[in-house]
């Protein structure tokens, strides 16, 4: 079994999701809009692509998530969040990037690309202009392309929109 897996969230996950927003996401765009328990229930019940990242070697610890909404046949990424520990620890980060999910086809963002491609759509990923790690992943590993920049969206930061419209597997260029 792969170290990491994805699963759909349940209402029991809401305290962990609120912790991500209120504590781990403080000072980031994730923490700009804090969701109540009812808000999270609505998200769990209605969003078409919402998966939690689970560490199978740590008793099923939820360490991140990807949240996206289907707009027509496209997938609009609302949030991607990974705990600081999993972003910053070299071994855990290596596993996130490479075979930690048991192959690239099981990775959170590639799943979103596949989901959109199966519906004849694209993945739209808005990112704060100073989020260098996310931008690097979108451009380098996942082959997204820059679509447009909306100035001062996060005042004073810009919002940069990337699109993946090929459906290709990640890490082909690495």
Residue ranges and their predicted role:
Residues 2-4, 57-65, 75:
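Glycine-rich phosphate/pyrophosphate-binding loop shared by adenosine-nucleotide-utilizing enzymes
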Residues 3-19:
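A short beta-loop-alpha structural element at the N-terminal edge
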Residues 73-98:
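Conserved acetyl-CoA binding element of GNAT-fold acetyltransferases
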Residues 28-54, 67:
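Active-site rim helix/loop that mediates acceptor-substrate recognition in acyltransferases
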Residues 148-174:
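C-terminal "cap" of GNAT-fold acetyltransferases
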Residues 138-149:
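Conserved acetyl-CoA-binding loop of GNAT-fold acetyltransferases
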Residues 90-114, 141:
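Conserved acetyl-CoA-binding loop-helix of GNAT-fold acetyltransferases
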Residues 124-136, 153-154:
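Conserved beta-strand-loop-alpha-helix junction that forms the acyl-donor binding cleft
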């Amino acid at each position: 079994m792969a170290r990491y897996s994805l699963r759909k969230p349940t209402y029991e996950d809401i305290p962990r999701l609120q912790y991500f927003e209120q504590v781990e996401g403080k000072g980031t765009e994730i923490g700009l809009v804090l969701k109540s328990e009812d808000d999270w229930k609505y998200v769990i019940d209605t969003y078409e692509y919402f998966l939690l990242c689970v560490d199978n070697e740590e008793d099923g610890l939820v360490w991140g998530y990807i949240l996206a909404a289907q707009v027509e046949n496209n997938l609009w990424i609302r949030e991607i969040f990974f705990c600081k520990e999993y972003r910053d620890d070299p071994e855990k980060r290596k596993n996130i990037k490479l075979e930690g999910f048991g192959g690239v086809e099981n990775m959170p963002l590639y799943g979103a690309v596949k989901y959109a491609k199966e519906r004849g759509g694209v993945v739209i990923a808005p990112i704060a202009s100073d989020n260098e790690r996310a931008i690097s992943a979108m451009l380098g590993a996942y082959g997204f392309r820059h679509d447009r920049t909306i100035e001062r969206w996060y005042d004073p930061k810009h919002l940069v929109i990337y699109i993946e419209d090929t459906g290709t597997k990640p890490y082909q260029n690495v």
